[in-house]
A protein has these predicted regions:
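Short, charged, surface-exposed hinge/linker loops at domain edges
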Residues: 1-2, 31, 35-66
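Short aromatic-glycine-(Arg/Gly/Cys) micro-motifs in beta-strand/loop hairpins
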Residues: 5-20
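A short, exposed loop/beta-hairpin motif centered on an aromatic-Gly-Thr core
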Residues: 21-31
Length: 66
């Protein structure tokens, strides 16, 4: 899953995974934002699997696009 990262005007970083609607997280550093969104996505995928929902096929867990 691709992680898109961008620095906001206020200095915070936002990381988003477009393949999973609503998966975005802010951090005070680029590394923090990426770590937060990765944790969020893993929890969301685990939740889908636990509830018998179809999860997207994942060949590589994360790829960061600057």
């Amino acid at each position: 899953m691709q992680v898109e990262i961008e620095k906001e005007e206020d200095g915070r970083w936002i990381a988003e995974v477009p393949a999973l609607r609503g998966a975005m997280a802010y951090g005070s550093t680029k590394k923090e934002a990426i770590a937060k969104v990765e944790a969020l996505v893993l929890r969301a995928l685990a939740d889908k699997i636990e509830h018998g929902e179809e999860a997207p096929e994942v060949n590589h867990v994360f790829t960061v696009a600057a």
